[in-house]
Amino acid sequence: MNIIVTGGAGFIGSNFIFHMLDKYPDYRIVCLDCLTYAGNLSTLEPVMDNPNFRFVKESITDRDAVYKLFEEEHPDMVVNFAAESHVDRSIENPQVFLDTNIIGTSVLMDACRKYGIKRYHQVSTDEVYGDLPLDRPDLFFHEDTPIHTSSPYSSSKAAADLLVLAYHRTYGLPVTISRCSNNYGPYHFPEKLIPLMIANALNDKPLPVYGTGENVRDWLYVEDHCKAIDLIIHNGRVGEVYNVGGHNEKTNLEIVKIICRELDKPDRKSTRLNSSHAR
């Protein structure tokens, strides 16, 4: 099996590459990543000498580069992690999110059509569903929950998902989509909630919590997410959307308190920021 993994130098993508090379030593994994601020090539250092791994620095928006890679590698499958994913950044500069998340996805699917891949998998987010009511902790998102986006980021991911499904219905492209809740674990980008709180607590810095801190998120360990994608790309039904979650709901304030407790730090008051957009 020859798999192109886009965005593989990022947090979830790199963990997925490690998982796949460890579980399937005969698979060939090609990482396509343009190394934006969220990508870190040193993350992939443990697999750089693996003969079944190749890294290519290119953007999924570069049609010529993508087609050239497909011609060289003849992939059986594409797993697309490549995305701009920070909500606040999408509010400041939405265009780059449209370019990468929508145009980049269309380039990949056109390449998949042209070169006849066996499966295209789109890694999406539960943010396309919007927010659950704070007073209804018993509710969960389902695959048939209506899309209700709240930022340029989530809108761009929802648009990409719809485009992927349209390519399946129009051209018969064999696709699957996964929408996951918040991940945590190794190589998490430091601007995200959990690594930021850990770093600040260790250095006795303020712990910035957005809004009231009562926003509820479902948290999933990144390796569990990788296992879910592995299962979907090998056994999932073409044309289906799969939600991936941990049923591990915590408010942001609960997360901060857990981190302070585990680090044996005093339960200091959090700094409230006037924003509800950061994840």
PLM regions: where:
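N-terminal Rossmann-like NAD(P)+-binding domain of SDR-like oxidoreductases, especially those catalyzing
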Residues: 1-183, 223, 252, 261-262
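C-terminal substrate-binding subdomain of Rossmann-fold SDR/epimerase-dehydratase oxidoreductases
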Residues: 3, 22, 29, 58, ...
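A glycine/serine/threonine-rich, flexible loop-to-helix segment
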Residues: 47, 135-136, 190-198, 259
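Short acidic-hydrophobic sequence patches enriched in Asp/Glu that either
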Residues: 36, 189, 193, 251
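Active-site helix-initiating loop/hinge in glycosyltransferases
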Residues: 185, 189, 218-221
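Short histidine/acidic/glycine/proline-rich micro-motifs that form metal-
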Residues: 35, 182-185, 215-216, 246
